[in-house]
From Swiss-Prot:
Plays an essential role in transcription initiation and cap-stealing mechanism, in which cellular capped pre-mRNAs are used to generate primers for viral transcription. Recognizes and binds the 7-methylguanosine-containing cap of the target pre-RNA which is subsequently cleaved after 10-13 nucleotides by the viral protein PA. Plays a role in the initiation of the viral genome replication and modulates the activity of the ribonucleoprotein (RNP) complex. The gene is PB2. It holds the Pfam family Flu_PB2_2nd. GO terms for biological process: 7-methylguanosine mRNA capping; cap snatching; DNA-templated transcription; symbiont-mediated suppression of host cytoplasmic pattern recognition receptor signaling pathway via inhibition of MAVS activity; symbiont-mediated suppression of host gene expression; symbiont-mediated suppression of host mRNA transcription via inhibition of RNA polymerase II activity; viral RNA genome replication. A motif (Nuclear localization signal) lies at residues 736-739. Keywords: Cap snatching, Eukaryotic host gene expression shutoff by virus, Eukaryotic host transcription shutoff by virus, Host gene expression shutoff by virus, Host mitochondrion, Host nucleus, Host-virus interaction, Inhibition of host innate immune response by virus, Inhibition of host MAVS by virus, Inhibition of host RLR pathway by virus, Inhibition of host RNA polymerase II by virus, mRNA capping, mRNA processing, Viral immunoevasion, Viral transcription, Virion. Belongs to the influenza viruses PB2 family. Its main location: virion. The record marks 627 as: Mammalian adaptation. The lineage of its organism: Viruses, Riboviria, Orthornavirae, Negarnaviricota, Polyploviricotina. This is Polymerase basic protein 2. It comes from Influenza A virus (strain A/Tokyo/3/1967 H2N2). GO terms for molecular function: RNA binding; RNA-directed RNA polymerase activity. InterPro entries: Flu_PB2_2nd, Flu_PB2_6th, Flu_PB2_C, Flu_PB2_CAP-bd, Flu_PB2_middle, Flu_PB2_N, INV_PB2, PB2_helical.
Length: 759
C-alpha cells in the first residue's frame, strides 16, 4: 500500500506525468532489449504503431509514376519524402487499396497451378461436412502425422533437384534427375509454368509443398491421414471434438493406404510359398500401385506398418528400430535384458520352449486403438498403465502385455493344447501360440492373474478381471489411465537383416517383425494395385487364376511354343502354372498330367497333328507331377464357381471357348485375348509365305542353337543360318537369302523343301 500511495503522490505532480509521457526512453538496458538482434520483440505493438503513422510502407520509386499522388477522395497516397536509409518512397496504406482497384492487371493463368495445394484445400473444405460437437475427455496421443495433403513422396534432395531444374534451369550446379517420378514431375511442371510471372522464390516454395512429405509430431485423437490433420484445430480440443468428413481425398493418403494393403497381401502370399523371401521380392518388383512401381514407393514412403516394413527390410532399406508383437509397436524406453532359452509347462502340461528376457525393462506399447506403458522384470509384469478408445481395445492391450511378460501364471492359465498354425500350415512359435490362445478367450488368464488393493491416484483407475472399473481393487499391476501414451517420436532408421522366412532382426539379433505380426484385416485399396506376379492371381479367387493363366500363355505364345517343342519339362515347371494346380481336384491331378503329356508327345511325333488351341487349353494340366496310367479323358475338371466345371479335351465348353472366326478366346464368358493360330493348321502351304526371304536347308541342326520363333527371324543377317519353328511344331534349318530378288521363288520351293526336311 505504501508503494501505491507513493506512486499516486508522484503522479499528482504535473512534472512527473510530463516526464513519463513526453521524454525519450534513454535507459541503456531498455534500448538494448528492443534494438539488439533482428527479431522483433513486440510485433503486434510494432504493427499497431506503424499503421498509425501516415506512411508506414516503403515502395520502389517507380510507384510515383504508376500511382497518382491523390485518390478520388483527395487523400494523399505517397509522400515526397524518401525513406531514410534507402532509395524508396514512403507510401500510405491507401495506395495499396488504389493499386488493388486500379493497378495493372496481370495474367492469372498460373495462379491455380502454382498455388495448387491451396486451391485444392479450399475445395476440400467447401465440400467437407462438419457434424455435431461432442464434449468429452479427449485421449490424445502424439503421433507422427503428415501435415501436407496432396504431395508427392520425393526426398528433400530429390525435390531440391527438381525445383532447381524447373525454377532455375540455367543456374550452374550438378543436378541428377534419376527416379521416374523426378523426371515426370519436372517435365509436367516445366510445361505448366511456361512464361510464369510469379516470383521464382514463391514458385520454389510452393513446389516444395507439393513434392515433399512434411511430418509433425502432434497430439491426435482421431483420423491421422493428412486430410484430417489439416483441420485438426477445427476437430479436436482439450474437452471437445467436432465430427468432420473431408470433402475429397488426396493421392498421398491413397498411396499410403494402398501400399499397406498391397504389402499385406504380398507378405501373406509369400509366407505360404516354397521360398518366402524370393517370392516376396519377385512380387514387390512386379507390382504397381496407381501406376507407380511399388519398389519406388517403398523407397520413398515413410509409412511404418508391419507388412510394409517387412517389404522394406527385404529390399535392404532401413526401418524403425521398434518391434512388433500382437499388433502393438513396442519401443524400449529404459533398462536392458539378455535372452535365454527356457522350457516351461502349460496348464495342460505341454512343454514350450520360450526365449526369456532376463532383466528389468520399460516399454511403450502403441496400437491402433490403445496405448500403454509396460514395466517388466524377468518373467514378471511390474506395472501396466493402459488407455484406449473402448473396453475391447483395452482388453487387447492387457492380453498382449500379459503374454509378453512371460509370467508363470499366464502360462499356467492355458487350457487345452496349443497347436495354432500359420497360413503355410507351420506351427507358430510359442509366444504367438500363447497370444492366439488368450486372444480367443482370456477369462482364465484374467481370473488367475490375481488382484490387489490400490491407492487413489489422479487420472488412474483399477480394473477387475471382468473388466469393470474400480477405485479400490485392480488386477495385479494393471491400471487404466485417462491419458494416452505418445507414439515413439524418433524418425531414426536402423539397418536390419531378414531371413528366408521373412523374420526381420536388428543387428543384435532381436526379432523386430515376422509374418505372424501382419494384420489379417482386409480393406479395399483406393488406388488400383496391379500384381503382375502369377503368385497374386489367386487373390481374386479361382476364376481370376483361370483367366490369368490362359492370358499368360497367349501373351507369351511365341516362346511357349518353342519350349513346348524343344524343352517341355522346363515349360511344365514354370511358376506361372502353380496357382492353376489348386483348381484341379487333388486325387486326379497326376493322371490328368500324365494323360496330357502323352498327348503332347504324340503331337510332337505325328506330323500334322499340332493344334494350337488344344495345346493352350491343356498345357496348365501338364504342370502337375505326372502319374503313368492308361486312362484316357474326354474332359478335365476344374473347381471354379464353387463346383467342378468341365474343360473338353476336344471342342469348346463354357470354361474354355475358342471362336475360330473371330480368333477370340473366352474363359468363363470373360474375354481372354486373341489367339494367333499357327499357319498350316488346316491351311497347307501358308508357312512358306512366312518364310519368304529364307532358304530352307533341311532338318534341324543343333549346332545353330535353339529354334527361333518366326518373329525373331527378322534379326538374322543376310547369309546367316538358324533353326526355326514352323507351323506344326516342327523345326527346320533356314538361311537368310543374300539377294532380295529371289524372294518370289521362295514360296513355291519352301513348301516342297519343308515336306522333305520333315520327312
Amino acid at each position: 500500500m505504501e508503494r501505491i500511495k507513493e506512486l499516486r503522490n508522484l503522479m499528482s505532480q504535473s512534472r512527473t506525468r510530463e516526464i513519463l509521457t513526453k521524454t525519450t526512453v534513454d535507459h541503456m538496458a531498455i534500448i538494448k532489449k528492443y534494438t539488439s538482434g533482428r527479431q522483433e520483440k513486440n510485433p503486434s505493438l510494432r504493427m499497431k504503431w506503424m499503421m498509425a503513422m501516415k506512411y508506414p510502407i516503403t515502395a520502389d520509386k517507380r510507384i510515383t509514376e504508376m500511382v497518382p499522388e491523390r485518390n478520388e477522395q483527395g487523400q494523399t497516397l505517397w509522400s515526397k519524402m524518401s525513406d531514410a536509409g534507402s532509395d524508396r518512397v514512403m507510401v500510405s496504406p491507401l495506395a495499396v487499396t488504389w493499386w488493388n482497384r486500379n493497378g495493372p492487371m496481370t495474367s492469372t493463368v498460373h495462379y491455380p497451378k502454382v498455388y495448387n495445394t491451396y486451391f485444392e484445400k479450399v475445395e476440400r473444405l467447401k465440400h467437407g461436412t462438419f457434424g455435431p460437437v461432442h464434449f468429452r475427455n479427449q485421449v490424445k496421443i502424439r503421433r507422427r502425422v503428415d501435415i501436407n495433403p496432396g504431395h508427392a513422396d520425393l526426398s528433400a534432395k530429390e525435390a531440391q533437384d527438381v525445383i532447381m531444374e524447373v525454377v532455375f534451369p540455367n543456374e550452374v550446379g550438378a543436378r541428377i534427375l534419376t527416379s521416374e517420378s523426378q523426371l515426370t514431375i519436372t517435365k509436367e511442371k516445366k510445361e505448366e509454368l511456361q512464361d510464369c510471372k510469379i516470383s521464382p522464390l514463391m514458385v520454389a516454395y510452393m513446389l516444395e509443398r507439393e513434392l515433399v512429405r512434411k511430418t509433425r509430431f502432434l497430439p491426435v485423437a482421431g483420423g491421422t491421414s493428412s486430410v484430417y490433420i489439416e483441420v485438426l484445430h477445427l476437430t479436436q480440443g482439450t474437452c471437445w471434438e467436432q465430427m468432420y468428413t473431408p470433402g475429397g481425398e488426396v493421392r498421398n493418403d491413397d498411396v499410403d493406404q494402398s501400399l499397406i494393403i498391397a504389402a499385406r497381401n504380398i507378405v501373406r502370399r509369400a509366407a505360404v510359398s516354397a521360398d518366402p523371401l524370393a517370392s516376396l521380392l519377385e512380387m514387390c518388383h512386379s507390382t504397381q500401385i496407381g501406376g507407380t512401381k511399388m519398389v519406388d514407393i517403398l523407397r520413398q514412403n515413410p509409412t511404418e506398418e508391419q507388412a510394409v516394413d517387412i517389404c522394406k527390410a527385404a529390399m535392404g532399406l532401413r526401418i524403425s528400430s521398434s518391434f512388433s508383437f500382437g499388433g502393438f509397436t513396442f519401443k524400449r524406453t529404459s533398462g536392458s535384458s539378455i535372452k535365454r532359452e527356457e522350457e516351461v509347462l502349460t496348464g495342460n502340461l505341454q512343454t514350450l520352449k520360450i526365449r526369456v528376457h532376463e532383466g528389468y525393462e520399460e516399454f511403450t506399447m502403441v496400437g491402433k486403438r490403445a496405448t500403454a506403458i509396460l514395466r517388466k522384470a524377468t518373467r514378471r509384469l511390474v506395472q501396466l498403465i493402459v488407455s484406449g478408445r473402448d473396453e475391447q481395445s483395452i482388453v487387447e492391450a492387457i492380453i498382449v502385455a500379459m503374454v509378453f511378460s512371460q509370467e508363470d501364471c499366464m502360462i499356467k492359465a492355458v487350457r487345452g493344447d496349443l497347436n495354432f498354425v500359420n497360413r503355410a500350415n507351420q506351427r507358430l512359435n510359442p509366444m504367438h501360440q500363447l497370444l492366439r490362445h488368450f486372444q480367443k478367450d482370456a477369462k482364465v488368464l484374467f481370473q488367475n492373474w490375481g488382484i490387489e488393493h490400490i491407492d487413489n491416484v489422479m487420472g488412474m483407475i483399477g480394473v477387475l478381471p471382468d473388466m469393470t472399473p474400480s477405485t479400490e481393487m485392480s488386477m495385479r499391476g494393471i491400471r487404466v489411465s485417462k491419458m494416452g501414451v505418445d507414439e515413439y517420436s524418433s524418425t531414426e532408421r536402423v539397418v536390419v537383416s531378414i531371413d528366408r522366412f521373412l523374420r526381420v532382426r536388428d543387428q543384435r539379433g532381436n526379432v523386430l517383425l515376422s509374418p505372424e505380426e501382419v494384420s489379417e484385416t482386409q480393406g479395399t485399396e483406393k488406388l488400383t494395385i496391379t500384381y503382375s506376379s502369377s503368385m497374386m492371381w489367386e487373390i481374386n479367387g479361382p476364376e481370376s487364376v483361370l483367366v490369368n493363366t490362359y492370358q499368360w500363355i497367349i501373351r507369351n505364345w511365341e516362346t511357349v511354343k518353342i519350349q513346348w517343342s524343344q524343352n517341355p519339362t522346363m515349360l511344365y515347371n514354370k511358376m506361372e502354372f502353380e496357382p492353376f494346380q489348386s483348381l484341379v481336384p487333388k486325387a486326379i491331378r497326376g493322371q490328368y498330367s500324365g494323360f496330357v503329356r502323352t498327348l503332347f508327345q504324340q503331337m510332337r511325333d505325328v506330323l500334322g497333328t499340332f493344334d494350337t488351341t488344344q495345346i493352350i487349353k491343356l498345357l496348365p494340366f501338364a504342370a502337375a507331377p505326372p502319374k503313368q496310367s492308361r486312362m484316357q479323358f474326354s474332359s478335365l475338371t476344374v473347381n471354379v464357381r464353387g463346383s467342378g466345371m468341365r474343360i473338353l479335351v476336344r471342342g469348346n465348353s463354357p470354361v474354355f471357348n475358342y471362336n475360330k472366326t473371330t480368333k477370340r478366346l473366352t474363359i468363363l464368358g470373360k474375354d481372354a485375348g486373341t489367339l494367333i493360330e499357327d499357319p498350316d493348321e488346316g491351311t497347307s502351304g501358308v508357312e512358306s509365305a512366312v518364310l519368304r526371304g529364307f532358304l530352307i536347308l533341311g532338318k534341324e541342326d543343333r549346332r545353330y542353337g535353339p529354334a527361333l520363333s518366326i518373329n525373331e527371324l527378322s534379326n538374322l543377317a543376310k547369309g546367316e543360318k538358324a533353326n526355326v519353328l514352323i507351323g506344326q511344331g516342327d523345326v527346320v534349318l533356314v538361311m537368310k537369302r543374300k539377294r532380295d530378288s529371289s524372294i518370289l521363288t521362295d514360296s513355291q520351293t519352301a513348301t516342297k523343301r519343308i515336306r522333305m526336311a520333315i520327312n
